[in-house]
């Protein structure tokens, strides 16, 4: 179910503070966050945000086409190792 339009998009306040602080400073560094639920705003474009996937922080460079999506969409939490291979040589006769 989509979020109500009257509520507007959501971004954690602590993440917005970090983005504003880095926009004001000359120094560009990776911004660490645990907020996978935050919506990407146009003010995030050009920043690298390290999003937590449950094990480590994965850096995501925010581009223009990512606006409106959630940060968690770009960092998978599960590692797919493939399906079990069929062993046809040792099959029953």
Swiss-Prot record:
One of its GO terms (molecular function) is rRNA binding. GO terms for biological process: ribosomal small subunit assembly; translation. Coiled coil: none annotated. It comes from the Bacteria. Pfam families: Ribosomal_S19. InterPro entries: Ribosomal_uS19 (IPR002222), Ribosomal_uS19_bac-type (IPR005732), Ribosomal_uS19_CS (IPR020934), Ribosomal_uS19_SF (IPR023575). SUPFAM superfamilies: Ribosomal protein S19 (SSF54570). One of its GO terms (cellular component) is cytoplasm. The keyword Zinc does not apply. Keywords: Ribonucleoprotein, Ribosomal protein, RNA-binding, rRNA-binding. Protein S19 forms a complex with S13 that binds strongly to the 16S ribosomal RNA. Belongs to the universal ribosomal protein uS19 family. PANTHER family: RIBOSOMAL PROTEIN S19P FAMILY MEMBER, SMALL RIBOSOMAL SUBUNIT PROTEIN US19M. NCBIfam families: rpsS_bact. This is Small ribosomal subunit protein uS19.
